[in-house]
């Protein structure tokens, strides 16, 4: 019988449950007096991150003369940080974000994200706050915490902070991954590949796991650790072998942030990817003064998928890309 692809891929019963979960999330933040905000999903700039591909469109003036290139946001991060610089205090947002070239069991080009920022909050304290959130919403046990370095030592018997190409190629061959790694000579890319294929699917099985202090090369928009410049103040959350969230003790140094954007575009050129215009509104906010803060982005579709014991986020979204 032909599939009724006009229908929702999620059952109405599950969509009601989804709505209730999101209501409970809003209640959690309301009780903590954290402000819910709304920011644009269209932006004049986009991210420079080489791992993200943005959707673009054009605004056309009514006389059809002027065009303005706009981007669908991959996350609300830059706009929310501009609010933080405007002294918003603690804020959160539940919104749709958009990432091209992403489809699969845990991916849809349009997805729902929870983004949350706490000014004057250390990474360690913020992880405790998120842990409480997960216990309430997921109804799970208290999470575990482990450093990125210790995770590699436990699983692969190598130290990612002082390894070398020879050692990484040897372990890749031992793990029968050499068909993927034999031509790769970028240390950081090899480390990320090993993490994704051999560690990530096997962690957080019984309860959520926070992996913190990612290598400095993977800092993204996180600050570098003051005591050890080899590591960043970045963490990720895993549960049942799935990445649920990505967080930082945020970088607030405008000059360092600009250097990272430039470095991203340099890497884009080397990979034959289009360079991206740097978001000067965001840099101006950093220059004005972003308060010391921690933030996290959590994939709500994945979170709801786990709560409802589904195997794909497409089972908790009404109309994923194949039905939209």
UniProtKB/Swiss-Prot annotation:
Reaction(s) the record says it catalyses: D-beta-lysine + L-lysyl-[protein] + ATP = N(6)-((3R)-3,6-diaminohexanoyl)-L-lysyl-[protein] + AMP + diphosphate + H(+)
Any one Pfam family match given in the protein's UniProt record, by short name: tRNA-synt_2
Keyword Nucleotide-binding: yes
Entry keyword Coiled coil: no
Name of the protein in question: Elongation factor P--(R)-beta-lysine ligase
Superkingdom as given in the UniProt entry: Bacteria
Alphabetical GO biological process terms: lysyl-tRNA aminoacylation
Oligomeric form and interacting partners: Homodimer.
Residues that hold ATP according to the record: 99-101, 108, 243-244, 299
Gene Ontology cellular component terms for the protein in this record: cytosol
Molecular functions (GO terms): acid-ammonia (or amide) ligase activity; ATP binding; lysine-tRNA ligase activity; tRNA binding
Organism: Buchnera aphidicola subsp. Acyrthosiphon pisum (strain APS) (Acyrthosiphon pisum symbiotic bacterium)
Lineage, opening ranks: Bacteria, Pseudomonadati, Pseudomonadota, Gammaproteobacteria, Enterobacterales
Record EC number: 6.3.2.-
Residues binding substrate: 75-77, 117, 250
Keywords per UniProt: ATP-binding, Ligase, Nucleotide-binding
Functional description taken from the UniProt entry: With EpmB is involved in the beta-lysylation step of the post-translational modification of translation elongation factor P (EF-P). Catalyzes the ATP-dependent activation of (R)-beta-lysine produced by EpmB, forming a lysyl-adenylate, from which the beta-lysyl moiety is then transferred to the epsilon-amino group of a conserved specific lysine residue in EF-P.
Gene symbol of the encoding locus: epmA
Family to which this protein belongs: Belongs to the class-II aminoacyl-tRNA synthetase family. EpmA subfamily.
